[in-house]
């Protein structure tokens, strides 16, 4: 059940308030008034019914005047409500216009920041573009150098090969004299020490010669490579110097175009042209030139837009300076006297306060303008120092440079001193700029409001100076002093009455003032701020003292009633705030219910329709949906309650204002006096409630009232005679009673005259008040027309601002698109840079590889030089020795050379044979491996085909056996399909095996039962034969007739009855279900079970118990059957019944299997459901509890 106590509390508010109000134009002003209206209706009914009391007859005109006064009061309240409504609309329109201006300014600042970001990104893009161009040029130069180096390396290689050949030719001796003698000497020397020496040293000598040639060639290569490296370094230095020069020239050209130095040259040049610096034909292509031209056009467009934005800023700041100049002149010229005139419910002090607020707002705007000027100066290229820029630039054309410090001090301290030096030429320039970048409607509206109020003040002042008073000798001064403190406080109800309650000061008792004035004497003058000092204050007459006392009581009671009414209004506002809190809390709760409903839907989908908890969850879902639908009704009720509370607060405010105005009107009546006492009483009343009005003579009013009283007397006499004619004609005996009544009526007439006079006075005052309110309403309507004009102008300005905003948004979108395109291009450039970096890395790797080769060559060169030195030393020694042995070796040199040639030829042939043998071995191994792979592939294909054929045959046989086609099909190239088919076949085979096992059990049971039945049949046949044999031995008829039936009955009782298989089946089924129940109980009591699983097992236990009870009841019913009347059927009939029962048993077994499968599914689904959703359900319940607790805390705060 939901707790609707809060809603019941809200619904009881109507009973507390009383009768419902029909409209805002009929406020319930007073509970006593309702009693009076009821009393007046009752008196009218008594008059109509014939109860002719003298008091009721004489009170009829008073009632009419009271009703007229009531109607006038209702009209006054209606007019005041309309006035408040129009004031509220004006304030709302003013706030809306100010909000729009702020939004436009925020958008403008965002645009400026976005423009700065775009400029920064454009500069970054330019730098990246320059870096990219430099990298491209470097990469191209490096690629060219690399290609040239490769060509040079190839040429050097070719030259080295030719030189090696030439050296080999030059090194070989045709006659072989030196080499032969050298070899002979070596052989001889070695042969002395080694007797087994053979002529094989010529091959080693050839190796030495080859090494020497290679050493010389490597030395030459190293020298050439060093020369080439020096040349490449020189070229790289020259190219880097050229690139640095070209980048400096380009930067200078761009700086010149940005500063406008090359304006004339740029106009003369062709647009979309590109500067060609250096050797452009080698480093740049046509695509790069077109790309650079597009970038230059975009840069030119961005510069144009930047110039437009700067011009717009300049025009905007010019307009701001012009407005400040006008406001300064207005403030300087607006010198007015502190008078006590009431202009639209505001005194001069209040006007000064409002002007101070306007000046404060202007100071804030001035500070913002100063910040904007600094920002503009920075955007235009300045340093942001206003001391220099404000005096030189045309943005602050109206402010002198000497006054900047005073401006800053005024802005810091909140002062209003800023000297503006207007110049005619600069004002003309300011009038030419017409770009509305900032909405100045608030300042203009304040200016217009101040001007209209100043005109009203001057007009009222002139009218008061021209108007001459008839009764008083003096007149008001041109500059009136301000009113008293109490008067201003009593009429501050029109200024924010709801937020700040009025402190009603209790006025002094009037009789004390009268006594003090009587004791002072006639020569003293009453010091009152509301009168001029020329008029003397007369004394108070004794006849007006009770009226003054009544007036004092009325004012005191109205003050007390105001305090209570204000407390009630505060309570209503608190209730309204609490209603909003209740509404927010209910919204949060309903949203939480939505999320919990979604959670229950997921649980229902997971559990399925077979679960017993599904129906409960569906019911909960329906309950959630109904509660969510009820949310709309509850929210509507809360909205209506909030509206009613808002209307109550408005009615309370209207009531307070009406009471204050009545108190003011009551005090006003006593300021109009014809004699000295009234003047004195008015001076006393003005001490506490004195609104300042114009004095007029009161004698004409008194005469009019006396005439009205005489007319009312005549009307009363005529009505009395007219009403009393009918009873006098009918009954002459009542004349004495009528005379008594007339005497009483004449006695009461004097009393009614005083009340009538008071009512007439009230009527006259109300009429005058109504006329004044109508005049005020006329003024308000005129002001409303002006306000509407201002609003239309503000709307037009707002439309213009919206258009500018739309333009700015379009510009922003274009800038964003430009930025996105630039980002895309930047990404492409980054990709190209990464590609170039990869190429550079490859080139660096190749350079490093070459350097490593050079280093290895240098190391080998050093080693070869060392070896050459050692060999040269050894050769010198050997040459000395060989000279001695040359003669001995000459004759054997020819033989040695031939043998050496043969050996070399044989070695080459051996090498060729070894390589051919290695290749043959490799090919043979490859061939064997390939043959094995082919055989394996064939074996696999045959095996797969045989397996697929076998699987197809097995699947066909199984489908024929089960009479069901397989869902999965075999795809030869897909292993997963074969696995699926195998799984399905296994499943089918396991199923068939289980069914065959079950069939075997059933057939075994059937065979056993058939055997039992056959045995029983044999027994029955034997018994029948025995009975037939006994019947043959029956005694004749007539003898022992009475004893025969006893024997037959005993025989029947002795025969065994037929045991029904249905009874046995019921017994076995009940026992089986009981065993299931016991097993489920054991599983239910096991430890480690989840709560949801326990619930499901409990439900299954209950259902199985119901099934057990049902079977047990059927068994009891079957036991109650009389077995004596059981029909002994034949064996064939029993077999057919057994077959039917067997079929029924199979159907029941299938159903039990289905139930078991569903139970397994629920068991498998419920634990996963609990594991997945347990935490979510806990968190959901916790969130609901926290939301409800938070809502209750918020509601109980106040």
UniProtKB/Swiss-Prot annotation:
<dbReference type="GO" id="GO:0007098">
    <property type="term" value="P:centrosome cycle"/>
</dbReference>
<feature type="coiled-coil region">
    <location>
        <begin position="983"/>
        <end position="1035"/>
    </location>
</feature>
<dbReference type="GO" id="GO:0005813">
    <property type="term" value="C:centrosome"/>
</dbReference>
<dbReference type="GO" id="GO:0042802">
    <property type="term" value="F:identical protein binding"/>
</dbReference>
<keyword id="KW-0217">Developmental protein</keyword>
<feature type="coiled-coil region">
    <location>
        <begin position="694"/>
        <end position="916"/>
    </location>
</feature>
<dbReference type="GO" id="GO:0008104">
    <property type="term" value="P:protein localization"/>
</dbReference>
<keyword id="KW-0131">Cell cycle</keyword>
<feature type="region of interest" description="Disordered">
    <location>
        <begin position="1"/>
        <end position="45"/>
    </location>
</feature>
<comment type="function">
    <text>Plays a central role in centrosome maturation and mitotic spindle assembly during the first division of the zygote. Required for the centrosomal localization of air-1 and zyg-9. Probably not required in late embryogenesis and during larval development.</text>
</comment>
<feature type="coiled-coil region">
    <location>
        <begin position="566"/>
        <end position="603"/>
    </location>
</feature>
<dbReference type="GO" id="GO:0005737">
    <property type="term" value="C:cytoplasm"/>
</dbReference>
<keyword id="KW-0206">Cytoskeleton</keyword>
<dbReference type="GO" id="GO:0045977">
    <property type="term" value="P:positive regulation of mitotic cell cycle, embryonic"/>
</dbReference>
<feature type="compositionally biased region" description="Polar residues">
    <location>
        <begin position="1"/>
        <end position="10"/>
    </location>
</feature>
<keyword id="KW-0963">Cytoplasm</keyword>
<dbReference type="GO" id="GO:0000159">
    <property type="term" value="C:protein phosphatase type 2A complex"/>
</dbReference>
<feature type="coiled-coil region">
    <location>
        <begin position="67"/>
        <end position="381"/>
    </location>
</feature>
<keyword id="KW-0175">Coiled coil</keyword>
<feature type="coiled-coil region">
    <location>
        <begin position="1127"/>
        <end position="1175"/>
    </location>
</feature>
<dbReference type="GO" id="GO:0140693">
    <property type="term" value="F:molecular condensate scaffold activity"/>
</dbReference>
<dbReference type="GO" id="GO:0033365">
    <property type="term" value="P:protein localization to organelle"/>
</dbReference>
<protein>
    <recommendedName>
        <fullName>Spindle-defective protein 5</fullName>
    </recommendedName>
</protein>
<dbReference type="GO" id="GO:0007052">
    <property type="term" value="P:mitotic spindle organization"/>
</dbReference>
């Amino acid at each position: 059940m939901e707790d609707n106590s809060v809603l019941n509390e809200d619904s009881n508010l109507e009973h507390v308030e009383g009768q419902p109000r029909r409209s805002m134009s009929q406020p319930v002003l007073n509970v006593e008034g309702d009693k009076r209206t009821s009393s007046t209706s009752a008196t009218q009914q008594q008059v109509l019914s014939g109860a002719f009391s003298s008091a009721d007859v004489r009170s009829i005109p008073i009632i009419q005047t009271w009703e007229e006064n009531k109607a006038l009061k209702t009209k006054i309240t209606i007019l005041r409500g309309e006035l408040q409504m129009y004031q509220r609309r004006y304030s709302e329109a003013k706030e809306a216009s100010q909000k729009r201006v702020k939004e436009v300014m925020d958008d403008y600042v965002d645009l400026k920041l976005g423009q700065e970001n775009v400029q920064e990104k454009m500069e970054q893009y330019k730098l990246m573009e320059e870096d990219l161009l430099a990298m491209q040029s470097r990469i191209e130069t490096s690629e060219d150098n690399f290609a040239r180096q490769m060509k040079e390396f190839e040429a050097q290689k070719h030259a080295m090969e030719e030189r090696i050949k030439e050296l080999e030719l030059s090194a070989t001796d045709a006659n072989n004299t030196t080499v032969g003698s050298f070899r002979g000497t070596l052989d001889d020397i070695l042969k002395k020490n080694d007797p087994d020496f053979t002529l094989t040293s010529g091959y080693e000598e050839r190796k030495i010669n080859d090494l020497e040639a290679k050493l010389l060639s490597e030395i030459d290569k190293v020298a050439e490579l060093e020369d080439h490296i020096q040349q490449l370094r020189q070229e790289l230095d020259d190219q880097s110097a050229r690139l640095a020069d070209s980048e400096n020239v380009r930067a200078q050209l761009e700086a010149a175009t940005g500063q406008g130095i090359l304006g004339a040259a740029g106009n003369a040049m062709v647009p979309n042209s590109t500067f060609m610096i250096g050797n452009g034909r080698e480093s740049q292509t046509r695509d790069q030139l077109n790309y650079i031209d597009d970038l230059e056009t975009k840069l030119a467009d961005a510069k144009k837009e930047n110039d437009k934005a700067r011009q717009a800023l300049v025009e905007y700041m010019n307009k701001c300076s012009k407005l400040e100049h006008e406001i300064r002149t207005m403030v300087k010229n607006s010198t007015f006297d502190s008078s006590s005139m009431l202009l639209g419910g505001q005194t001069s002090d209040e006007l000064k306060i409002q002007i101070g607020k306007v000046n404060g707002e202007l100071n804030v705007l001035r500070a913002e303008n100063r910040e904007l000027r600094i920002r503009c100066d920075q955007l235009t290229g300045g340093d942001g120092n206003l001391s220099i820029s404000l005096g030189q630039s045309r943005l602050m054309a109206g402010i002198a440079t000497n006054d900047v410090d005073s401006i800053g001090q005024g802005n810091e301290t909140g002062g209003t001193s800023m000297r503006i030096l207007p110049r005619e030429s600069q004002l003309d320039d300011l009038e030419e700029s017409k770009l509305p970048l900032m909405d100045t409607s608030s300042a203009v509206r304040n200016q217009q409001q101040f001007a209209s109020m100043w005109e009203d003040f001057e007009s009222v002042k002139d009218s008061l100076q021209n108007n001459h008073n008839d009764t008083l000798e003096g007149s008001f001064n041109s500059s009136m002093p301000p009113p008293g403190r109490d008067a201003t406080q009593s009429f501050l109800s029109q200024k924010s009455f709801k937020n700040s309650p009025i402190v009603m000061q209790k006025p002094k008792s009037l009789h004390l003032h009268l006594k003090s004035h009587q004791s002072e004497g006639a020569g003293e003058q009453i010091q009152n701020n509301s009168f001029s000092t020329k008029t003397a204050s007369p004394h108070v007459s004794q006849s007006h003292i009770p009226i003054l006392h009544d007036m004092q009581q009325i004012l005191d009671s109205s003050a007390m009633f105001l305090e209570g009414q204000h407390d009630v209004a505060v309570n209503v506002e608190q209730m309204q705030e609490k209603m909003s809190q209740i509404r927010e809390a209910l919204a949060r709760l309903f949203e939480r219910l939505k999320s919990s409903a979604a959670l229950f839907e997921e649980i229902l989908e997971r559990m399925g329709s077979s679960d017993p908890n599904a129906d409960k969850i569906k019911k909960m879902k329906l309950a959630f949906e109904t509660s969510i639908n009820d949310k709309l009704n509850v929210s509507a009720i809360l909205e209506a309650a909030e509206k009613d509370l808002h209307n109550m607060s408005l009615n309370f405010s209207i009531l307070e204002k009406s009471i204050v105005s009545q108190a003011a009107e009551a005090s006003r009546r006593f300021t109009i006096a014809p004699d000295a006492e009234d003047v004195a009483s008015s001076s006393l009343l003005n001490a506490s409630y004195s609104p300042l009005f114009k004095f007029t003579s009161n004698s004409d009013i008194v005469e009019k009232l006396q005439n009205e009283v005489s007319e009312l007397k005549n009307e009363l006499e005529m009505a009395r005679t007219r009403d009393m004619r009918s009873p006098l004609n009918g009954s002459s005996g009542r004349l004495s009673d009528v005379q008594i009544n007339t005497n009483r009526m004449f006695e009461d007439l004097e009393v009614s005259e005083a009340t009538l006079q008071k009512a007439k006075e009230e009527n006259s005052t109300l009429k005058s008040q109504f006329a004044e309110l109508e005049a005020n309403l006329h003024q308000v309507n005129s002001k409303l027309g002006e306000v509407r004009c201002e609003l239309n102008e503000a709307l037009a300005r707002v439309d213009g601002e919206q258009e500018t905003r739309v333009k700015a948004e379009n510009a922003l979108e274009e800038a964003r698109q430009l930025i996105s395109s630039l980002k895309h291009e930047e990404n492409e450039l980054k990709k190209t840079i990464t590609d170039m970096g990869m190429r550079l890395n490859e080139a660096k790797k190749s350079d490093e590889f070459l350097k490593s080769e050079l280093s290895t060559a240098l190391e080998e060169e050093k080693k070869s030089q060392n070896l050459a030195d050692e060999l040269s030393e050894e050769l010198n020694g050997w040459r000395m020795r060989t000279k001695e042995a040359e003669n001995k070796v000459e004759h054997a040199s020819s033989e040695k050379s031939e043998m050496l040639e043969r050996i070399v030829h044989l070695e080459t042939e051996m090498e060729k044979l070894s390589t051919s043998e290695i290749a043959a071995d490799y090919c043979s191994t490859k061939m064997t491996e390939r043959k094995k792979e082919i055989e394996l592939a064939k074996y696999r294909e045959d095996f797969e085909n045989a397996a697929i054929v076998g699987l197809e045959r097995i699947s066909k046989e199984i489908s024929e056996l089960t009479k069901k086609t397989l869902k999965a099909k075999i795809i030869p190239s897909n292993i997963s399909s074969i696995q699926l088919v195998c799984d399905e076949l296994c499943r089918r085979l396991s199923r068939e095996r289980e069914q065959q096992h079950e069939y075997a059990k059933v057939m075994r049971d059937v065979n056993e039962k058939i055997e039992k039945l056959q045995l029983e049949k044999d027994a029955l046949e034997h018994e029948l034969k025995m009975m037939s044999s006994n019947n043959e031995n029956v005694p004749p008829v007539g003898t022992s007739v009475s004893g025969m039936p006893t024997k037959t009955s005993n025989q029947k009782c002795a025969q065994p009855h037929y045991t029904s298989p249905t009874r046995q089946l019921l017994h076995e089924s009940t026992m089986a279900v009981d065993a299931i129940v016991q097993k489920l109980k054991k599983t239910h009591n096991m430890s480690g079970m989840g709560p949801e699983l326990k619930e499901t097992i409990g439900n299954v236990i209950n259902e199985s118990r119901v099934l057990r009870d049902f079977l047990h009841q059927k068994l009891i019913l079957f036991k109650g059957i009389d077995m004596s009347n059981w029909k002994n059927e034949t064996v064939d009939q029993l077999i057919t019944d057994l077959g039917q029962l067997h079929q029924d048993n199979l159907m029941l077994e299938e159903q039990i299997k289905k139930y078991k499968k569903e139970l397994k599914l629920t068991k498998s689904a419920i634990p996963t459901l609990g594991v997945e959703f347990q935490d979510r359900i806990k968190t959901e319940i916790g969130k609901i509890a926290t939301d409800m607790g938070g809502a209750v805390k918020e509601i109980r705060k106040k």
